[in-house]
Amino acid sequence: MLRVPDVKASLVEGAARLSTGERVFHVLTSPAVAAMVGVSNPEVPMPLLFEKFGTPDSSTLPLYAARHPELSLLRIMLSPHPYALRSHLCVGEETASLGVYLHSKPVVRGHEFEDTQILPECRLAITSDQSYTNFKIIDLPAGCRRVPIHAANKRVVIDEAANRIKVFDPESPLPRHPITPRAGQTRSILKHNIAQVCERDIVSLNTDNEAASMFYMIGLRRPRLGESPVCDFNTVTIMERANNSITFLPKLKLNRLQHLFLKHVLLRSMGLENIVSCFSSLYGAELAPAKTHEREFFGALLERLKRRVEDAVFCLNTIEDFPFREPIRQPPDCSKVLIEAMEKYFMMCSPKDRQSAAWLGAGVVELICDGNPLSEVLGFLAKYMPIQKECTGNLLKIYALLTV
């Protein structure tokens, strides 16, 4: 926690308002969140999220609401616990005695787990512009415990809990002095830590070779709970079932985990939130170098997946903006899972007729996933509605389609 040394500071819409009129707030780096709030820059001021969802609280933002399905998408992008519905995004705290405190990085708070920092990179910034368009990043030194600001009214707080008491016993023996090296004896200037900190060894997927090796390893076996980190195992397992509804490559003999991995490698290549690091912790220790033809095939799969997702979003934009004069009264002859996925997708968008858009969208997405050329699908749509050639928010829609 970082203390705001201003006696007249207050929390307003996710930011600390100072006595000088300036505001201190968090700026998170996420292209998907930027697309959600309508910002062209990937750096998103946190108060814009509070303003978009109109929360009455000035320090916390609920991550679930029945009337705001976009909050669920925001929870998936930010929270390390994406399936904890009763959770809140917390930027800081304000008390009458201690004043205003800001988290160094916003945390997700819930009854089922301890406070956990959000996933995207985040920094503190300050501005006097209430629209948050022009701001300056605050550089925090290592170990800093307060926000370095120039306020007219500062608050001094004495932390009594930091006091230490040491009692000396006159009967106790004198402490032994450490053995000092002899004069002239050389000593190493290297510093060695006595305590060995055990950290999880995560293999980062920085090359196509590693990603291709991971893809084929996932095809050979499923992760085992006793041999895997529990948090990453649960994340991958739950997302395989709940956020993997659309199979964009149905004619290939791939398991569901391989489909999920391909989607998140594509998300990573686009700079969007993904769980590739979770796959890395589950399979990274067993990677073997991929062969040349395996890397080429894996790259071709990614290109095919990207093309089909972009084609699907292009067609769904046309369906979204079309005012159906007569509603579609019969669902398409496709899987129920795909229809439900389209219903969830159009809950995040705002079509003119949600049910008709979901039913028609399911049929169109199935045609694209089966490998039909985009020209043929557009020729079919053009018989019933004008083709929408330009639309905004495509990055967010691609993320929604890959994680629905």
UniProtKB/Swiss-Prot annotation:
Domain of life: Viruses
Keywords from the UniProt entry: Host cytoplasm, Host nucleus
Keyword Transferase tagged: no
Entry's transmembrane regions: none
A Pfam short name: Herpes_BTRF1
Localization (cell): Host nucleus; Host cytoplasm
GO cellular component terms attached to this protein's record: host cell cytoplasm; host cell nucleus
InterPro entries hit by this protein: Herpes_BTRF1
Signal peptide from the UniProt entry: none
Assembly behavior: Interacts with ORF34.
UniProt similarity note: Belongs to the lymphocryptovirus BTRF1 family.
Purpose of the protein: Plays a role in the expression of late genes.
Protein name (record): Protein ORF23
Originating organism: Human herpesvirus 8 type P (isolate GK18) (HHV-8)
Annotated gene: ORF23
